[in-house]
C-alpha cells in the first residue's frame, strides 16, 4: 500500500504548523471554505474534530464548538462527506494537505468500526487520534487501521513515564501527539506545568525516549509559542485559539477570512 499523505509530509523533515478545526463551526457551510483558507495560508496538516456531545477531554471552547457543530447538523457521516468533497475540490479548491480526525470512540462505534475505517480511508482521511483509546487495547484497531492505510496517533502527557513514552512511540504509526501540560484542550497555562523550564525539560525527555517524530498541542496560541515549540518538537498544533478567533463569524465566507487572517499571524 502506498504511503499516505502524513508519511510523505513527515519525510520532508520540516517543522509543522498544524491546524485543529471543528467542522461546521461556527455556522453551517463553513467547513470547506475554512479548509481552503487554512491550506492557502500554510497549514501543513489539518486536524478535524469529530463532534461529540460529551467531549470530556476538551476544554470549554472546543466543547462549545462541538455542541454548535452538532446543532448545525454535523455527524460522522457528514464529516466524511465533507472530507470527500474537499479532496475532490467540490465547493472549494482541492485540499491536498493531510487530514487527521480527532475524536472519541463512541461515535465511531455507533457508526460501525470497520465501516468507519473503510469510509474514512475512501473519503481521503489520512489518520486518526482517539484520546480515549487505551494503547494497551489498541492492537486490533491498529491492525485494521493499517489495513486501510490510516495513521494512528497516540497521546503523551507530562506525567507519562519514560518506559510508557517509548511504548506509545512504538505504537504510533508515524508520530506521537504530545500534550504540553496536564489540562483539557485549550486551557493550558505555563503555571499548569510549573514553569516554562518544566515544559522544556518534559519535551526534551520525550525527545530522548522517542524514535519517531512528535508534535505538541493544547494551549498554543501565537507565533512566539509556535516558534518555541518548534525548537523542541517536530510540530505545533493550534486549535482553541483558531476557534476563538472565528467564533463570531456570521457566514461561511467571514469564517474563512478570519481563519486565513489568523493563520497568517502564526507564520
UniProtKB/Swiss-Prot annotation:
Protein name stated in the entry: Tryptophan synthase alpha chain
Catalytic activity: (1S,2R)-1-C-(indol-3-yl)glycerol 3-phosphate + L-serine = D-glyceraldehyde 3-phosphate + L-tryptophan + H2O
Domain of life from the UniProt record: Bacteria
Assembly and interaction partners: Tetramer of two alpha and two beta chains.
Keyword RNA-binding on entry: no
Assigned keywords, A-Z: Amino-acid biosynthesis, Aromatic amino acid biosynthesis, Lyase, Tryptophan biosynthesis
Chain's role: The alpha subunit is responsible for the aldol cleavage of indoleglycerol phosphate to indole and glyceraldehyde 3-phosphate.
EC number of this enzyme: 4.2.1.20
Organism from which the protein derives: Chlorobium phaeobacteroides (strain DSM 266 / SMG 266 / 2430)
Pathway: Amino-acid biosynthesis; L-tryptophan biosynthesis; L-tryptophan from chorismate: step 5/5
Active site: 47, 58
Entry annotated with the keyword Lyase: yes
Protein family membership: Belongs to the TrpA family.
InterPro entries for this protein: Aldolase_TIM (IPR013785), RibuloseP-bd_barrel (IPR011060), Trp_synthase_alpha_AS (IPR018204), Trp_synthase_suA (IPR002028)
Amino acid at each position: 500500500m502506498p504511503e499516505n499523505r502524513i508519511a510523505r509530509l513527515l519525510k520532508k523533515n520540516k517543522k509543522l504548523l498544524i491546524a485543529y478545526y471543528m467542522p461546521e463551526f461556527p455556522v453551517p457551510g463553513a467547513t470547506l471554505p475554512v479548509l481552503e483558507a487554512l491550506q492557502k495560508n500554510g497549514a501543513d496538516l489539518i486536524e478535524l474534530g469529530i463532534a461529540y456531545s460529551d467531549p470530556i477531554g476538551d476544554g470549554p471552547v472546543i466543547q462549545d464548538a462541538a455542541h454548535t457543530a452538532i446543532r448545525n447538523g454535523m455527524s460522522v457521516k457528514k464529516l466524511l462527506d465533507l472530507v470527500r468533497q474537499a479532496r475532490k475540490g467540490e465547493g472549494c479548491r482541492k485540499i491536498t494537505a493531510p487530514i487527521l480526525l480527532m475524536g472519541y470512540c463512541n461515535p465511531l462505534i455507533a457508526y460501525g468500526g470497520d465501516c468507519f475505517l473503510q469510509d474514512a480511508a475512501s473519503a481521503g482521511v489520512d489518520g486518526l487520534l482517539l484520546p480515549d483509546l487505551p494503547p494497551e487495547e489498541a492492537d486490533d484497531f491498529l491492525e485494521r487501521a493499517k489495513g486501510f492505510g490510516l495513521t494512528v496517533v497516540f497521546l503523551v502527557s507530562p506525567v507519562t513515564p519514560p518506559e510508557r513514552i517509548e511504548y506509545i512511540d512504538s505504537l504510533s504509526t508515524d508520530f506521537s501527539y504530545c500534550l504540553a501540560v496536564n489540562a483539557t484542550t485549550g486551557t493550558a497555562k505555563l503555571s499548569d506545568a510549573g514553569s516554562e523550564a518544566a515544559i522544556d525539560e518534559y519535551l526534551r525527555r520525550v525527545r530522548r525516549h522517542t524514535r519517531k517524530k512528535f508534535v505538541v498541542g493544547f494551549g498554543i496560541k501565537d507565533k512566539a509559542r509556535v516558534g518555541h515549540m518548534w525548537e523542541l518538537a517536530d510540530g505545533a498544533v493550534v486549535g482553541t485559539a483558531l476557534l476563538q478567533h472565528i467564533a463570531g463569524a456570521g457566514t461561511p465566507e467571514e469564517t474563512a477570512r478570519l481563519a486565513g487572517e489568523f493563520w497568517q499571524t502564526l507564520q
